Structure formats: C-alpha cells, structure tokens
C-alpha cells in the first residue's frame, strides 16, 4: 500500500494527464469542453507551429497553442515529457514489462533530434515530412478509432499507438529516449539555450565545440532540404485516387496530415475514413471520403450544411471552411459526379427518372431531352462532389458516382 501511494505521489500528475487527454480525445466531456479534443494535438509545436509553416497559412489563435511548450523547453528541457505527455507515460509503463531489456536502448542511436530537424526543415520547404510521428497526434489518433459507427478501417488510426507500446516492450524506453521528435525538439531547444548561455559567459566567443555542433546541424539539414523540395515536386501519385474532405489540397495532404483522426471523429455522418493505400504509400491513413455511411438512418453524403471536419484539423491539411460558403458552393470541389449512361434508368431504359436532379443541392444536374425522356447531365463547373446524387440514385448498380478530381 505504501509503495502504491509513493508511486502515485511521483506519477499522480501523469496519470491525471492521461485520463484528461483520453477523455478529451474520446469526446466524453461536457459540450462546452469538446473543443479540447482539437486543442490536444495543437499543444505540440510540431503540429501547431511547424504545421502552420508547412501549410503556409495562419489558422488563428490555435497556432499559438504550441508556443508555451516550446518556450518552456528553453528553460526546463523535456519537462513536458517527464510530467505531462500521455504517450510517453504509457510507453514508459510498457517498458517496465521487460526488465531484462533495459540496456538495449543504449545500442540504438539517438534519432529524435534528427527527426525533429527533418520535420522543421521540410516544413520550411512547404512539405513537412514525418509530421505524423508527433506523440500527441498518435495518442489522439488511437482514440479517434473509438467512434460510432465502429469500423475496423477506422481503427487503423491507432496503429502508431500500438506500435509504440510494442516497441517499448521490445526495447524499453526507446521511444522517449531515442525516437520521439517532440522530445527531440524540446531537447534541441534546451541545448540551444545552454549553448547561448555558455557562449555569453565564455571569455572567448569562439567556441570550437559549438562550431562543431553547428556544422553537424548544417550537414544534417542538407538531406532534409533535398527531401522536402523533392517531395514537394511530387513523390506521390500522379493523380488523386480518392475523394478527399473539403478544402484538402490533394498535392500536399499526404505531408500535412498528422493522421490524428480529428476529422474522422468530427464527421457527424461517418463518411471520413483512413486511406489504406489507394493514394500511395505516402498517403496511408490520410482522410478519404466514402459517400455511403454505415448508418442507413443518417445522411450518406457530404452535407451542404456541414463543415465540421475543416474546423478541427491541427496542421492546416484541411483549411477552415465557413458553413455559409459551404452552403453556397463557394469552395473547391472534392470530386465530380459522372453519369453511367449504360446503367441510368433514363438513358438506358427510356424511363423518366430525375432523382439526382432533385437531390443535388448545388443545381449541378440538368435534364436534357432525349426522345421523350429527360436525361440527367452533370455540369462539372457547378458540381462540388458532395455525393447527394450518388447516395440517392435508385438504379442498381448505381448509375451516378462521384469520381476524384485529377491532380493538377
């Protein structure tokens, strides 16, 4: 009993942090506290500051949420890791399951600062690689899987969480001490602060050790610059292969997306799912839209009145979209509807059917007279790819489907 109380005395704050962050991520809090699930990933300067840098956009006050942690790191180093980080605490508990492997971490090179440098430099290039390694977004992504309706594909957002725990059992403390980029960023900030203090106190400003460190940093940054610029020019697929949520930039979402699962949790219709390979390896677990939800009682298309997913992205992969603009169709299309004339009741069977025209909220479907029957034709300039036509088409198989827009 005394040992348990002693343990709680040392780690009580970390336990509270895990519980609070988990409740926020799950949304099991009062309505007034629901924005906390959006705030959690943005507490990391990797997602808030470097994400905004990579997206080249100012996302309001939320960008500043990562500033306190970054400033604190200059004075207290990795205090967030050792006192508050929920992912780090769980990884530490998992490490205790293998007391025989405690020394194994010493054989693993410290990559955390290098990973933080890669993210920072590639963000400056406009294509932030590896941003999804942030521990807060990994923690958040695991709890994003527990949403209604449950789907095994959605559970894949928690693979990083499980992988870190398994890795911590195999090589105790390897995540926190060797791999975590957020820890590396905090350590780099503390190292910089200490170096500046030593330089100021030194009698001679020419510090050879500092010069060596600076030289190593420059040498490490060069490959990151090359990777960022090369990826920005197009390491991904040549064309979009999936319908993305509104405001997503198909050319950069694979890099900007943190795989935190916020957009999937926010969608009230359960239409957003993690990609499982249709957009290439670099697009794994990024959000894609499936225009037929699992709940037949809910709307099965991207509603004209909903822009919830665009309000919760911590990195700018989805840009905020005002509900009024969504209703008016003043946003970039997420896809375009295509009529299969061989399957369409009007075109193939000469029977009157105007269901797609009736349900289209953007008046993108017009009827053209062919013989005695009015047949649907899609105006690609008006179509936003919402899928209202597809989800209500009475034909079997469906005669009108939303196709992804080709990448420009």
Where are these regions (language model features)?
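Non-ligating segments of multi-cofactor redox enzymes
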Residues: 1-408
